[in-house]
Amino acid sequence: MQIFVKTLTGKTITLEVESSDTIDNVKSKIQDKEGIPPDQQRLIFAGKQLEDGRTLSDYNIQKESTLHLVLRLRGGGKKRKKKTYTTPKKIKHKHKKVELAVLKYYKVEDDGSVKRLRRECPNCGASTFMANHKDRLYCGRCHLTLKLEN
């Protein structure tokens, strides 16, 4: 019987085969006509890839059926090298949660009055305290720095 093999270029090859022929035999006949090695050939019929050991009758390939020939692609994408860093990673600052942190900012005097332990920022207003350094006061919000005189 006669079958057709359509290549990717659109060229159609005619092959004389029997329904008992294996897919290996068909691929070797394509190699004789086109010069493509059988290990690079993939034959597709009715949306299925044809396996080498099976026969044409296994796939219900009859006379004047058309097989599609595509080439097998070898391998995958290029592997990327893993980046090597010259300097070690910087350790992230861990935030320490302090229970009842408000107690650091105020003190209750013996007479019952409340005294502020830290100075509030004159630019930012109430509830923004300045950090105490050994020679200065610093506001972390507006970056105001006040120098202390001893």
Swiss-Prot record:
GO cellular component, one term: cytosol
Zinc finger motifs (C4-type), residue ranges: 121-142
Gene Ontology BP annotations: cytoplasmic translation; modification-dependent protein catabolic process; protein ubiquitination; ribosome biogenesis
UniProt cross-link Glycyl lysine isopeptide (Lys-Gly) (interchain with G-Cter in ubiquitin), position: K6, K11, K27, K29, K33, K48, K63
UniProt keywords, alphabetically: Cytoplasm, Isopeptide bond, Metal-binding, Nucleus, Ribonucleoprotein, Ribosomal protein, Ubl conjugation, Zinc, Zinc-finger
Ribonucleoprotein among keywords: yes
GO molecular function: protein tag activity; structural constituent of ribosome; ubiquitin protein ligase binding; zinc ion binding
Domain of life (superkingdom): Eukaryota
Pfam families: Ribosomal_S27, ubiquitin
Keyword Iron-sulfur: no
SUPFAM superfamilies the UniProt entry points to: Ubiquitin-like (SSF54236), Zn-binding ribosomal proteins (SSF57829)
InterPro entries: Ribosomal_eS31, Ribosomal_eS31_euk-type_sf, Ribosomal_zn-bd, Ubiquitin-like_dom, Ubiquitin-like_domsf, Ubiquitin_CS, Ubiquitin_dom, Ubiquitin_ubiquitin-like
Database matches in Gene3D superfamilies: 6.20.50.150, Phosphatidylinositol 3-kinase Catalytic Subunit, Chain A, domain 1
Domain Ubiquitin-like: 1-76
Residue location of crosslink Glycyl lysine isopeptide (Gly-Lys) (interchain with K-? in acceptor proteins): G76
Note: Ubiquitin is encoded by 5 different genes. Ubi1 and ubi2 are synthesized as a polyprotein with one copy of ubiquitin fused to ribosomal proteins eL40A and eL40B, respectively. Ubi3 and ubi5 are polyproteins with one copy of ubiquitin fused to ribosomal proteins eS31A and eS31B, respectively. Ubi4 is a polyprotein containing 5 exact head to tail repeats of ubiquitin.
Protein family (similarity comment): In the N-terminal section; belongs to the ubiquitin family. In the C-terminal section; belongs to the eukaryotic ribosomal protein eS31 family.
Protein name in the entry: Ubiquitin-ribosomal protein eS31A fusion protein
Gene transcribed to yield this protein: ubi3
